[in-house]
Amino acid sequence: MSSTTLDRPADKEYASFYAGYVALVPEGGLFALLEQQAVGTQKLLRPLGEPKSQHRYAPDKWSIREVIGHLADSERVFTYRALRFARTDATPLPGYDEKLWAQTTNAHTRTMASLLDDLQVLRTATLSLFRGFAEAD
């Protein structure tokens, strides 16, 4: 994947559930978008601090920390799936229960800074993996 741009996938290339997410991605180079998003996320969330990171807008809703944990979990899952596609592994990919994962996470006990550090390291690893894919992948 030496190119920094990819064509937007055709509707038949992803489950209809993801159509809204795909539509939200701006046009542009993949790596630049991923890098900009990482910077923007850090700039938005780091100033919140620890007390605000525990905020829930309603009972039984995720805190900001838990949302960040979910972002990290999702990036891990989708990066793993991208690796499987790149390696032409045809084994069926199971889904995952994000609600169960949220119930069993330790995001609420971690500091906001550690969660954001983890998210940044994870994005750096994602970019490294994607840059390492051959064009044919």
Predicted feature descriptions by range:
Residues H70, S74:
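Histidine-centered divalent metal-coordination motifs
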Residues M1-I64, R76-D137:
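Aromatic-glycine hotspot motif
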